[in-house]
Amino acid sequence: MIAKKPFIQKLSDRIVVNVENSIVSAGNSAMDVLERSPGVNIDQNDVISLKGKAGVIIMIDGKPSPMTGVDLANYLRGLPSATIERIEIITNPSAKYDAAGNSGIIDIRMKKDQRIGVNGTFTAGYGQGIYPKANTGTTFNYRTKKINVFGNYNYAYRVGLNHLLLDRNFYESGVYNGGDLKDNYSTSPFSSNATRLGMDFFPNKKTIIGFVLNGNFNHYTRNNNNSSIVINPQKQAINTFNSRATNNDHGNNVLGNFNFKHTFDSTGKELTADVDYGVYNSSSLTVNSTRYYKLDGSSLQPDYTLNGDQDGELTFKTAKVDYVNPLKKGAKWEAGFKTSFVSSDNDAKFFDVSSGTPQNDVNKTNHFLYHENNNAAYLNASKEFKKFSLQVGLRGEQTNIKTEQRIGNVNFDSTYFQLFPSAFFNYKIKEDQTLGLSVSRRIDRPGYSQLNPFLFLIDVTTYATGRPGLLPQLTWSYELSYTLKNLNFTASYSHTINNQNIAIAKFRDAFPNIPSAENVTVQIPINLASSDYVGIGIAAPVRINNWWNMINNGNLYYEKFNGSLGGTNLQKGRPVADIRTNNSFTFKKGWSAELNANLNTGAQYGFMVLDPQWGIAVGVQKAILKNKGTLRFNVSDIFWTNLPKAVITYNNYIEKWHAYRETRVANLTFNYRFGSNKIPAARRRTTASEEERQRAN
């Protein structure tokens, strides 16, 4: 029997989710795996949070993705779990990492074959929920003593579902002033072609020179059907309207990386360098038509049709250098420098074609340019003693921002410098007992889409927009940990200022110069004054017997938000319990199985309160073809209960929503491995573009 790593491991500074050995993860996407990872939650807008705190940096092999929002969600949905080795969850990173990420870092580590000779894998899978999903891919690796050439190609096709029910209620001075009931059914066929090609060259035993080229090409169609019933102040239905929207989106993302590593001597003194250049292009064609009806089904007013043509380009250039210098008696210091340049160009043209003749909609047409330069330097010092270890670090980051809104000639410039100290202390009480303490200061800059002032039409009563003046949020985080044998306990506290949140405002209040109907809303990012977070956690692996292993993770936390919006003061929080268990079973003749379960008692995010959610996933695996192949079958959320539901409350507005998604999916996956089994020492690359790739678009 070959031992394998558990699905979830709790290390001293991070949680590791070993995806490649997970049965229930087979055939799923990276997004699906994240949703089942300890402390990770994903809301109805695809915003990823960690232990109830938003502001997570998603990294791919140490490189933060420049994508955010819908684009990041689409990328993760198109990334098959078969290409992922593990996911590392780091809640309190050191000064060596970019200071971005209010709640920490989630680093998705891709598979990279380390065997000598020609090696590879082939994977094919099919999934069925309400709609089909399929993926196939191959990886190859050719390694000698002088070179290592590697690459992969993956194709994914998925049809997503989001059936959203909304009950919106408006108030004036505490008196009900009407509202509407919405039934929004959205399907989203999505296809992705992802490629990766790289080479490492070993001119001598001390030097490695490498490059990696990544390409991701997506096609995403959103078909949205919305039926709305309009309610008057007397709580009577007075009319209806139906909206149909189709978005035809394309995304072409290319990223190149050059890297260098030189080890000076056997003590571990080394110099590494990375240079990245990436271009992300996107285009979207939109058709949004609305018909208005009286209650008897006759026409109420002329139809409204809006066509949109949006193009975007994001380019980023980053470079970084890191130096590690071990000293005598367990001491070490590290230093590094990084610079990055990001440019975003978004051009949106909208036309009212209700009359049959296209007319430019000047309130929605826009052209927005964004330029950002970040310069950072850090210094870390650490020392190992007999019973304890200490690490202190300081990182400085300067940010220069320039925006240009060409229509309306509105410009915004900003420059700021911030220091980000960090400290880590570990004390070995006994051989099987360890005490740890960490503190760090971090920043969460707005995503590029949050800064874009475009006015996006969701339906005729719902819009979304961004704010160029949105401030970054700053967080002080503290964590105390205690490890006893296999048990790990944590207690954490954080204080955040300028807390970023999505608010819902009346359109007339946000855009008084643009004519609108009475009960029209706009989703807009805001800065709350602050938030405070306190939590405790436990990780408890249990070996029931030689064929049954259990890993239990629990987090209990409370987050309080402070701020105000439009006369609504927010001084609220609520306790939340997030509990997850993973059970793995190993049987004879190559059979194994998994059972996972999760429970979240419901959290508060600013003005929104979520209901409890829970789910169970099961899977079974059989080793075949002389252990070179595996066949896996799993079903996620078998009772279809892991569905978000929430209430959003302001003084003049209350919204209740319930989202039905395709969380229950049955997957069948086949994987075959070929080639040599001789494995040399592995090399893992991290590169320069650490924050930029997270915030794109």
Language model regions located:
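Short, acidic, small-residue-rich periplasmic hinge/interaction motif at the N-terminus
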Residues: 1-23, 43-45, 51-55, 90-93, ...
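Face-selective signature of the C-terminal outer-membrane beta-barrel domain
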Residues: 194-218, 243-404, 428, 432, ...
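N-terminal periplasmic accessory domains that precede
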Residues: 30-33, 72-74, 89, 101-123, ...
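Extracytoplasmic beta-strand/coil segments of soluble accessory domains associated
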Residues: 31-68
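Surface-exposed extracellular loop regions of Gram-negative outer-membrane beta-barrel proteins
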Residues: 109-124, 163, 167-170, 181, 400-402, 431-477, 494-518, 638-651, ...
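Short acidic/polar hinge/loop motifs at secondary-structure boundaries
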Residues: 64-91
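Outer membrane beta-barrel strand-and-loop segments of large Gram-negative receptors
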Residues: 307, 316-320, 361-366, 471, ...
